[in-house]
């Protein structure tokens, strides 16, 4: 798979357990049952979900749910992951967890594309950023380029913005 997509809105099956949420996707991969279980075990471990594997998704915190969603997005081992508003609706501790997961994906050689309005959270983990206004890219560059741009400050960030 070339790209996997994680929508802004929750995509977990709330009445299924954490493991079942992975399993339902794994069943469509063509892997043997043994390989499916092994892949689920790896994802549970990698995303700190092992202790929650029997918990229903309905009872997960925002950060736990987001980790499960990212784990599901990686089941087919994509080259890129598109994260739509990954920092929406999660607490500050979970933001740090998600930032760590994004860094880990990058370290694994998985490209991460993020669309998000939470500028501070996003700019601290990205290599390159694009500022769009009314559907048009008006500025691109490193996070420092964006933060220090008068244009970015006037059309989006505001004069008092800092990382």
Named regions from a protein language model:
Residues 16-35, 46, 159-160:
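ABC-type ATPase nucleotide-binding domains, specifically the catalytic core motifs of the NBD
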Residues 23, 34-52, 100-103, 151:
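Conserved ABC ATPase "signature" region
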Residues 56-60, 64:
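Conserved ABC ATPase signature
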Residues 70:
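Hydrophobic anchor residue at the start of the ABC signature
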Residues 77:
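Conserved catalytic motifs of ABC-family nucleotide-binding domains
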Residues 81-85:
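Catalytic Walker B motif of ABC-type/P-loop ATPase nucleotide-binding domains
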